[in-house]
Amino acid sequence: MELRNMNEAEAFKSVLNSCTGSVWMVSTLTGRHYDMKNEHDQLLSMGKMLSGNGRDMEIYADTRADQSRIMNFMVEQMAA
């Protein structure tokens, strides 16, 4: 997953903060887990996504509602 600019990063952060369950990202290269409800981990993972190194990041959410929120955000960003 990649972000193209700070506006997308802020919008993504807003989506993450609206999630009610656990949300995490995993680097497929290193296996590192990022807790996306933790501000420090958000900054680290978003830095990767903004720098073009987010292709190896996979996102997961505990609840279907959160999965839907994140998927809707991703679809909207691809359409923009």
Sequence positions of predicted segments:
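C-terminal structural segments of small proteins and small subunits
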Residues: 50-80
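Compact, glycine-rich, soluble single-domain proteins
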Residues: 2-28, 33, 40-41, 47-49
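Short, well-ordered secondary-structure micro-motifs
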Residues: 36-37, 70
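Generic alpha-helical scaffold signal
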Residues: 6, 36, 61-64
